[in-house]
Regions:
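Structured, active/binding-site neighborhoods that engage oxygen-rich ligands
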Residues: 1-177
Length: 177
């Protein structure tokens, strides 16, 4: 992910577009390099779909964590500028994801940009939250976990109240949701 993002920015510049991302994927990696949302998006590119349609057309994984995994580089190249990191992450994520799938990448990129100039973990997390919609499920869930932590809940208690009780993977939710 880091190498691909680096090549993208070197070739298309910091103002790259989602279409630049899709073209880089097609030019630089094989179709077998991807899984879940990214594999569907790649197939959609090959079938002529451009972003953002490439993200949602027949893509049941469109809100999973694949884009979140790609967010690191945009945080690294924007130290102290979480807004720029999140904006670049949005453009990258929008080719393969929608809603919380996009917000995850924005959240990670913003936190890494902030972490370059700040060591306060709560401030870093709140910075990440400030870059995603307050109405999103990701914002709600990360806020719950943060509040549980600040209230002194143990890791196990936090898992139980914030994850297992809310998202039972036996009840229609995959853990990647």
């Amino acid at each position: 992910c880091l190498v691909m993002a680096n090549l993208l920015v070197r070739q298309a510049g910091r103002a790259f577009t989602p279409t630049d991302v899709s073209k880089a994927w097609l030019a630089l990696q094989s179709k077998n390099a991807y899984f879940t949302a990214e594999r569907i998006a790649y197939r959609n590119f090959m079938n002529g779909f451009l972003p953002p349609e490439s993200a949602w057309y027949k893509n049941p994984y469109r809100e999973w964590i694949g884009a979140q995994i790609r967010g690191d580089y945009f945080g690294y190249i924007n130290p102290g500028n979480p807004e720029a990191a999140a904006e670049m992450a949005f453009r990258d994520a929008s080719i393969s994801h929608v809603k919380n799938g996009i917000y995850g990448e924005m959240f990670v990129a913003a936190m890494l940009a902030k972490a370059a100039v700040c060591s306060d973990m709560e401030e870093i997390i709140r910075t990440g939250l400030s870059e995603i919609p307050e109405s999103s499920r990701l914002f709600e869930q990360v806020s719950r976990v943060l509040e549980a932590y600040l209230a002194g809940a143990s890791f196990e208690e936090t898992l139980q109240t914030c994850l297992y009780c809310r998202y039972d993977d036996q009840n229609g939710h995959h853990w990647c949701h």
